């Protein structure tokens, strides 16, 4: 298929319908939207679809907690999600839901085809069951220690630390997220997709060279570990689609979620009379691309193409994987206000600022992207306001006042204009390969050249001298011509700024028409195209995020949910507010050796310690008497103490520090221990 005749379908991963969109989500959707808008500018037939992922136990349980039907919850969330995406100018052709008739039909069709082709197996499995809630526990409602890397607090289906996949019954020390109870094992008949049958096909797909190297390498690790049959069924109660021919079995959410790509596109096809089969038949020549995050690579690189192959449908042309978003070099934090919802951002800042910042830092690799808020302000103001928009404003005034808005009929510097046009192919290649950061750097280098041209020509000087009217018009027109080319190159990134620029230029910006300058052309009076970002806006957004997160935690819904807090969660004290590394560094924790320990007769709680710190001896009173009824046994052991705590005069003597212990109090207290070989006075780091 020639590039002039490309037919392309693009999807983003489906946001889960139980929470708001945040700036982490927006990275993927902005990345995909920039690529889609570029392809539209190139004249290709391209469709961009997405949907809410609306099935699964989490939605069922959250709706129950809220006292509403799951259908009402997902409808409300979908409306909110779509509003956020529209706010960031994400140009979906369709935004649907996996809880749709189209998705039900496709899910049943694919399942039936897989079954007819011999790729569905059934067998009884031992499954974790919550004895308190009388329900089988989905993978994501079991947590425990990863059986592979031993990372704690991992879900029942895969480890977020080492990316290993496993059965929930393999978890070490599993617990129910629903009730906190320790699950028991019960048998249930389940349906499995025979993934190992597709290993040869998947290996060939992996070796095709189309996939990102990081994806291909990760797939090879999974091949080396051995592919396993995939459990595609869940027991009732469950919110989703019932498996045909069963009474109480439902499709696992990860079976019908990617099928939602097809369902959303089918919904669009039905409304716009598009040929669906032309994009999804096995022999389709159309291009199909999925933009996803690195946390769901496994499903999209193994299960999804294998399901399509087994159902006699086409496979994706490629999956484009991105990393996570950090803020100021750290994971997004609710307490710090850096877990920023899309709706919160939109109340304080122009969405085009974030689109530009993300674009400036995006590559086609799976690298995490850091949203440094100080750099964000500086980059937006410098690049977009001081350089780009200023290029138009500093020339437009002369054109409007002195020449009635009419541009010159000849270029002042044809060679410079041609230099800008010559970069079109390179910039287009960067966009095509999703190297948006490189495209932006190339465009801003041209912007610097354009401003250098204006600075050297100094139209404000020419304007003061008689007889140089023609020169003034040509110089200022040249500045406008260069601005137009730059704005055309940035149109996929900044669609609204491009729209305002088109109104100012009174000409549409297309990739092809940029090669022809606007000679003897009338432009509109210049109006402000873009506003500077003030650091106070950032501060207000952060404070609003903190307040929103605090409100969620104290809302009636949260109180209702708190009443259902799991037994496991209620066993522990809540986390304190986050502190910085500098705050932590203020504490001087030291290893100390117990020289003597005795009960304080007049106190029911206190033991009196004499501690050797290596360089001095300290007396510490510690309220652990109930846990250590025979204090003499503590003599000679090592403990950890806070050594720089101000001495405190107590009723029974002076206490010169604090000994660290863990537990809920009373008899449930345990002194922290250290390995053999450590010396008294050693600092804990």
UniProtKB/Swiss-Prot annotation:
Positions the record marks as coiled coil are none
A Pfam family annotated for this UniProt entry: Anticodon_3
Stretches assigned to the tRNA-binding domain:
583-685
Task: Give the residues the record marks as binding Zn(2+).
Answer: 146, 149, 159, 162
> Motif ('KMSKS' region) spans which residues?
331-335
Keyword RNA-binding assigned to the entry: answer is: yes
Q: Where is this motif: 'HIGH' region?
A: 15-25
Q: Which InterPro entries match?
A: aa-tRNA-synth_I_CS (IPR001412), Anticodon_Met (IPR041872), Met-tRNA-synth_bsu_C (IPR004495), Met-tRNA_ligase_1 (IPR023458), Met-tRNA_synth (IPR014758), Methionyl/Leucyl_tRNA_Synth (IPR015413), MetRS_core (IPR033911), MetRS_Zn (IPR029038)
- Enzyme class label: ligase
CC cofactor = Zn(2+)
Annotated Gene Ontology MF terms?
ATP binding; metal ion binding; methionine-tRNA ligase activity; tRNA binding
**Catalyzed reactions per annotation:** tRNA(Met) + L-methionine + ATP = L-methionyl-tRNA(Met) + AMP + diphosphate
Where is it mainly found?
cytoplasm
Q: Name one GO biological process term.
A: methionyl-tRNA aminoacylation
Chain residues that bind ATP: 334
Instruction: State the UniProt keywords alphabetically.
Output: Aminoacyl-tRNA synthetase, ATP-binding, Cytoplasm, Ligase, Metal-binding, Nucleotide-binding, Protein biosynthesis, RNA-binding, tRNA-binding, Zinc
Q: EC number(s) per UniProt?
A: 6.1.1.10
Domain of life per record:
Bacteria
How, per the record, is the cofactor bound?
Answer: Binds 1 zinc ion per subunit.
| GO terms for cellular component | cytosol
Localization (cell): Cytoplasm
Q: Give the matching Gene3D superfamilies.
A: HUPs, Isoleucyl-tRNA Synthetase, Domain 1, Methionyl-tRNA synthetase, Zn-domain, Nucleic acid-binding proteins
Q: What does this protein do?
A: Is required not only for elongation of protein synthesis but also for the initiation of all mRNA translation through initiator tRNA(fMet) aminoacylation.
Relate the assembly described in the record.
Homodimer.
Name under which the protein is recorded: Methionine--tRNA ligase
Q: Which organism is it from?
A: Actinobacillus succinogenes (strain ATCC 55618 / DSM 22257 / CCUG 43843 / 130Z)
